């Protein structure tokens, strides 16, 4: 907390205030046992030093079963949650959740609890892992994902593709054409969507 106070004070003194304060980093921020308290403290600091800045939370959605995490995320301006597919086998192969009880249906149900105060972030790609195809731009992945988005009714959807080298060299970017086609289908449901290539 002290480091954040010093940084915000320095920025305020320089007249260079941040646009956004983001909870992210090395690991899952919502897994911190005091995440809710950290959000509250950050809101107070934001209000004091940079009241125009927005608070964003980037999460893999694995801690949404904890009510205190959901309540804290309701307080941030941009509650950004990952949902790369609705296929459990795909998630186990690609995302490799640490929790063996992880189920995408549970995550979708928890995302619906935000009542629209959520931004869904999804990465589309091509390639293979351990000899298995992990391209998720095919209709068998996109159609059920779109149905989940319809059920969740997020404020916005952000779709993107691989941006930097991955641990597995067999992974490749989805094309702008594919991302734009998916983006249009989200927008056709009346939900704002951005695509990053």
Task: Show where each model-derived region lies.
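Conserved alpha-helical substructure of the radical SAM core
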Residues: 1-22, 37
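Conserved hydrophobic residues forming the short capping helix/wall of the S-adenosyl-L-methionine
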Residues: 12, 46, 186
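Short, charge-patterned binding micro-sites
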Residues: 23-27
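Conserved AdoMet/S-adenosylmethionine-binding subsite of the radical SAM
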Residues: 30-160, 165-172
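Binuclear metal-ion centers of metallo-dependent hydrolases, dominated by the metallo-beta-lactamase
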Residues: 175-197
């Amino acid at each position: 907390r002290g480091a954040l106070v010093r940084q915000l004070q320095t920025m305020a003194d320089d007249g260079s205030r941040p646009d956004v304060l983001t909870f992210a980093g090395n690991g899952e921020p919502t897994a911190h046992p005091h995440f809710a308290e950290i959000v509250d403290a950050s809101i107070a600091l934001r209000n004091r030093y940079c009241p125009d800045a927005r608070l964003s939370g980037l999460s893999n959605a694995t801690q949404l079963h904890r009510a205190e995490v959901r309540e804290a995320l309701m307080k941030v301006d941009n509650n950004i949650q990952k949902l790369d597919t609705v296929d459990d086998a795909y998630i186990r192969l690609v995302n490799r959740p640490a929790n063996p009880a992880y189920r995408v249906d549970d995550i979708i149900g928890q995302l619906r609890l935000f009542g629209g105060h959520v931004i869904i972030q999804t990465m589309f790609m091509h390639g293979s892992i351990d000899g298995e195809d992990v391209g998720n731009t095919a209709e068998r992945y996109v159609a059920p994902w779109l149905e989940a988005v319809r059920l969740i009714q997020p404020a916005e959807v952000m779709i993107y593709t691989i941006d930097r080298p991955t641990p597995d060299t067999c992974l490749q970017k989805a094309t702008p054409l594919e991302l734009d086609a998916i983006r249009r289908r989200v927008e056709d449901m009346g939900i704002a969507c951005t695509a990053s290539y």
